[in-house]
UniProtKB/Swiss-Prot annotation:
This is Large ribosomal subunit protein uL16. PROSITE patterns: RIBOSOMAL_L16_1, RIBOSOMAL_L16_2. It holds the Pfam family Ribosomal_L16. It comes from Lysinibacillus sphaericus (strain C3-41). Belongs to the universal ribosomal protein uL16 family. Binds 23S rRNA and is also seen to make contacts with the A and possibly P site tRNAs. The keyword Metal-binding does not apply. One of its GO terms (molecular function) is tRNA binding. The lineage of its organism: Bacteria, Bacillati, Bacillota, Bacilli, Bacillales.
Amino acid sequence: MLLPKRVKYRREHRGNMRGEAKGGKEVSFGEWGLQAQTASWITNRQIESARIAMTRYMKRGGKVWIKIFPHKPYTKKPLEVRMGSGKGSPEGWVAVVKPGKIMFEIAGVSEEVAREALRLASHKLPVKCKIVKRQETGGESNES
């Protein structure tokens, strides 16, 4: 499970998830990526579940990069407790994902295997996803 080693504050505000992702919109390490189309919190358990689904389908071949990390603690009050009397205790960790963010990347496998592995991973996540291919950059120059 992914979780921070230590944090400055145990509890955080919920925040908002308006707008698109600021960075991490391109496939930078692998050949194929899984891109979020909607905004959501993704828990450390969901990230781990998606990772296991991908690696099992690839039969330990290729390489997987996880590009999101659950830095944000979320809290929950116990069941049947009245409102008030402070914020609840930390329940788990989430990664805030906005539209356009590349969450996972894959390299070292064929296109069919990569597409199917990312499709299986997308079913484990609470966001709509799109499978994207790496864009080659810096090929030609305009000088003559």
